């Protein structure tokens, strides 16, 4: 089975790739993350992923749309509910690309995170699969999250401190009282 794996970052991807390869899945990575801001953060995560992909011979498709304005426009009306829009943007584009490029299925490294809303992501991914008539390969990768983080530290990957959007970065600092609201 040929699967297109949407990748948010190398620390999340490494154990997803390893798990899928162990299952005999032929994995190709897909970088599409218009939610990641600022540009320096976007570039750092993308470059780390490129290095990781090369080191494990992971084919990588990049859709380098640094899209601050379109992303903010998409989520501005409901900042608190932005995650569903973010999942939709990335998972629908992954399904579309997978279909267009002849893959059997798609999935995402987002499913490794204990911090993401798995049920919501599954629902969005299934809608994307139905829309583009391609299989959504669901795997709950959370059990290998810690192994992925350990691998990332061992290989000196860039380790981000927030999910990617400027709003999650703001929340990170508000929770630690590092900025004044």
Q: Where would I find each of the regions flagged by the language model?
A:
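Nucleotide-activated chemistry modules centered on ATP-dependent adenylation/adenylyltransferase
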Residues: 1-181
């Amino acid at each position: 089975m040929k699967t297109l794996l949407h990748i948010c970052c190398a620390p999340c991807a490494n154990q997803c790739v390893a798990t899928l390869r162990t299952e005999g899945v032929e994995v190709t990575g897909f970088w599409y993350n218009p939610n990641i801001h600022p540009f320096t953060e976007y570039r750092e995560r993308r470059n780390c992923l490129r290095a990781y992909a090369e080191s494990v011979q992971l084919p990588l498709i990049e859709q380098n749309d640094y899209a601050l304005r379109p992303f903010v426009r998409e989520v501005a009306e409901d900042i608190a509910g932005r995650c569903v829009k973010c999942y939709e943007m990335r998972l629908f584009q992954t399904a579309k690309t997978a279909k267009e490029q002849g893959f059997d299925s798609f999935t995402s490294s987002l499913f490794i995170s204990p911090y993401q809303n798995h049920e919501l992501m599954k629902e969005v991914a299934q809608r994307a699969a139905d829309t583009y008539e391609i299989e959504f390969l669901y795997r709950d990768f959370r059990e290998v999250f810690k192994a992925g983080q350990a691998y990332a530290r061992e290989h000196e990957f860039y380790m981000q401190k927030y999910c990617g959007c400027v709003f999650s970065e703001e929340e990170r600092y508000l929770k630690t009282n590092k900025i004044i609201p």
